[in-house]
Amino acid sequence: MTGAAPHINEQFAEAAFSNQSVIFDDLYSGDTIIGYKRKRVRDHILKYLKSGGSILELNSGTGEDALFFAKEGFKTHATDISKGMQQQLREKVAKHGVQHLVSNELCSYTELEKLNNKGPYDLIFSNFAGLNCTGELDKVLSSFAGLLNPGGMVTLVVLPKFCLWETLLVFKGKFKTAFRRFFSSKGRKAHVEGVYFDCFYYNPSYIKKRLKQEFDILGVEGLCTIVPPSYIEGFAEKHPRAYKILTGWEDSLKGSWPFKYIGDYYIISLRKR
């Protein structure tokens, strides 16, 4: 059933990702397409963010991106609602000796006003659909301006309401997956490690509309528009030549219409005036 109260849905999401935290890196760290997605997001950010800046990361997970940015010389305050993910992140940060560059805090992105470390920051960053786990994205977005330096950035990686690859799965008889984004205004059920919670889809226009008073758009890119989504497992390994061709096409067309709007995700960046 969809439509759980926001705080209840948040508790379900926390439980799901805490369950997944101990196996998260084993599940995803070796996946070729996930590696491609991470590189695309990081390259996008590095185009705009000045070296040595400070980052507030939302839904930071086990800290893969926080570690990357630490190695690039950025300071990151990594937040998450999942106790399990925060524990994995702390262990990883200690292992790599970057405690001086990565701090962490257990905090919901719907309650950023409660942050102990309020910055201000040069970038607020949310990767890989973390923000799709709330039906209160408007509340999250409204808190951004006060946490940023003048000229600070927001970069979000979000699932839109339409994905070309996903819709094409109808031809494989996967009707539930093919149409799951079409009737999702009240949320669609997601299932992670034995726990169900509601997932919501947002187009770039939703974010632009709610931030337009204080932010300018820097860019929107489609992600896994031509390259298959990572849940089509093993594609890159089974079809290396096709994968290489598709990545080349996507890299060329990522910021063009309609490709920037029909991927599994989109990357959107905005700058505070």
Regions flagged by a language model, labelled:
Residues 190-206:
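Acceptor-substrate binding/catalytic loop of class I
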Residues 1-50, 64, 68, 153-184:
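Conserved class I S-adenosyl-L-methionine
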Residues 209, 218-273:
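A C-terminal cap/extension of S-adenosyl-L-methionine-dependent methyltransferases
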Residues 123-136:
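A short SAM/SAH-binding and catalytic strip from SAM-dependent methyltransferases
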Residues 62-112:
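Class I SAM-dependent methyltransferase SAM/SAH-binding core
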Residues 114-124:
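A short acidic, Gly/Pro-enriched loop at the edge of an enzyme's catalytic core
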Residues 138-153:
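A short glycine-rich, Lys/Arg-flanked "PGG" loop and its adjoining helix->strand segment in the class I
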